[in-house]
Amino acid sequence: LDNIFRDIRPDAVKIGMVSSAALIKMIAEKLKEYHADNIVVDPVMVATSGAKLIEDDAVSALKEYLLPMAAVLTPNIPETEVLSGTPVKTEKDMITAAKPISETYHCAVLCKGGHQLNDANDLLYRDGSCQWFYGKRIDNPNTHGTGCTLSSAIASNLAKGFSLDESVERAKQYISGALAATLDLGKGSGPMHHGFDLRSAFIEESTENVAKGNANQKTTGGQQ
């Protein structure tokens, strides 16, 4: 972390599963030391199957040190239930549960409803307001890592300068495309196709960046 922040400072930070309480505390200390921006925390504690992924002391450390630093949290339904102490069975329950989480940790909460509820509808709750991001369930058994990818995509878009709403919307579109590409690797539930649109997306953004760079050079040259 020292090398990263001292060399090329990241414009956003995404934190996934951290199983050790000591490591959680150290990460939080370093993020605070470097005044990290756009911290996206995927509070990985409970698998969508309900299986417990980290020990109780790590959960306590996560709540005490990392969650209060987040700009946005991205819990799945079981994690939302753990953080709020409220059972979540409906979209109305998602709103009820997201409110105390947001108020406790003073951040936005993106409650992911795709695994337990009927459609891939996610709720963004912040400052007392709700915004839904709707999506249709895609028939693809290879969904391993969707939550991790979503939070990473949100952080990537925040780093590019998009607003939180835009970052979530773009991340949702990316996930939908990656799932629809139906990559089939190995046995069991495999990963989605992360590189399904990498070429066109890269070319589009590179063209925009080059155009901006050329415009800036012309402006600077004119001033000189």
Model-derived regions: residue spans:
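Conserved phosphate/ATP/ADP-binding segment of small-molecule kinases
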Residues: 56-130
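Charged C-terminal helix
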Residues: 165-224
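Short pre-catalytic strand/loop immediately N-terminal to key active-site residues, enriched for Gly-Thr
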Residues: 130-144
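Glycine-rich beta-alpha junction loops
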Residues: 19, 45, 79, 114-117, ...
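Short, small-residue alpha-helix embedded
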Residues: 81-82, 140-164
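Conserved N-terminal subdomain of the carbohydrate kinase-like
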Residues: 1-48, 52, 200
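Short, charged, surface-exposed loops that flank catalytic or proteolytic processing sites
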Residues: 87-94, 159-169
